[in-house]
């Protein structure tokens, strides 16, 4: 959904992902929006404050958390996905006047991240020092996210933390903050 002047989704946005056929292991199933640079304050009710994933979330307490979008990215030597928040009930991205957008879970919690990078930005660079943040904000909201596994060496993601090849639904309500 893209609107130039004013965004208004009166009821809710419901997207269902139904995998068919053979496909590779996916990192996430969801939607991504590009938002104006002014909406730089990220607040969420869910797991935090550190980034967390399906297989690494027990150390992240459920609560109301707040930070800048830049603070959500974790500088690993090799750029990779980071900043994910699990079990999000609602989030806001706001400017200095506390105006912006709010996203609420409708049926079930969702995963989310707000970064100054797209997935393509992260995966095309081999060193963190070469990464250039975008001024705009990339808001990802997901029905399912792949666990991290052992990332660097050894076994990958355990089967129970992989994205199951079944129907996944993201049901959210987007409104003005």
Each model region followed by its residue ranges:
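Beta-strand/loop-rich accessory regions of lumenal/periplasmic or secreted enzymes
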Residues: 3-6, 10-177
């Amino acid at each position: 959904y893209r609107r130039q002047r004013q965004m208004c989704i009166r009821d809710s946005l419901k997207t269902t992902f139904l995998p068919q056929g053979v496909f590779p292991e996916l990192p996430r199933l969801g939607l991504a929006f590009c938002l104006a640079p002014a909406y730089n304050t990220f607040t969420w009710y869910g797991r935090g404050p550190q980034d967390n994933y399906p297989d690494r979330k027990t150390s992240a307490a459920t609560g109301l958390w707040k930070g800048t979008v830049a603070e959500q990215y974790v500088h690993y030597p090799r750029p990779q996905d980071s900043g994910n928040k699990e079990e999000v009930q609602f989030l806001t991205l706001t400017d200095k006047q506390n105006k912006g957008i709010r996203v609420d879970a409708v049926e079930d919690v969702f995963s989310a991240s707000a970064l100054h990078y797209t997935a393509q930005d992260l995966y095309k660079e081999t060193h963190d020092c070469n990464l250039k943040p975008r001024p705009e904000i990339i808001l990802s909201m997901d029905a399912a996210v792949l666990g991290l596994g052992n990332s660097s060496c050894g076994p990958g993601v355990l089967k129970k933390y992989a994205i199951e090849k079944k129907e996944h639904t993201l049901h959210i309500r987007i409104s003005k903050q």
